[in-house]
Amino acid sequence: MRNKITIIVLSLMMLIFTSTSYACNFQISQFGDPKEKIVIEPVPLSFPDQFGGESLAIPIQDLCKNDSSLYGTMVVYLYIENKLSQIQLYRPNMEDTKLMDFAMKKYGKFNLPEGMPKQRWRGSYQWEIGNNYIEYISTNIHDGHAEVIEITNKLYANAMAEYNAKVGEWLDSQK
């Protein structure tokens, strides 16, 4: 009897540890680190911009090979003054709410309007967890719908606000 219990407990522990090791960890660099710390194959696409930022874009399937649930999502690492300032998960034109489900599971549930299907909800929700501000956004885009998760470390929130102000001024000038 004791051997059966031991085998069951060990089997459960292996199952738990195995499933934990397959969880997707898209934060492959720490906030404040330079972009040179990201060493991944294939080499990520780099997009410098006119506002003092540089983005590295990596398909999530390159980061989370054992977890296909978020395939189709792009992970964008935004560097300001060569310091990681924001991580964004961007999932455009997918006919699902997988980023919403991921956000609710990882950061905490939030209420949707009663009777509204998740696929039709548009809006945003914010969490403050530890040293990070996290925002989930569901919005319409030109040819459909996009889900976004933005993670900003509190130490870089002011730099992000200044960066976003520059982007906003430029967008306003384009009207």
Regions found by a protein language model. Give the residues of each.
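Non-cytosolic coordination micro-motifs
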Residues: 22-57, 86-175
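Compositionally biased P/S/T/G-rich terminal and signal peptide-adjacent segments
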Residues: 40, 46-80
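Position-driven detector of the extreme protein N-terminus
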Residues: 2, 14-15, 161
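Disulfide-bonded cysteine motifs in exported proteins
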Residues: 18-19, 59
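Bacterial N-terminal signal peptides that target proteins for export
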Residues: 1-9
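Bacterial N-terminal signal peptides
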Residues: 8-17
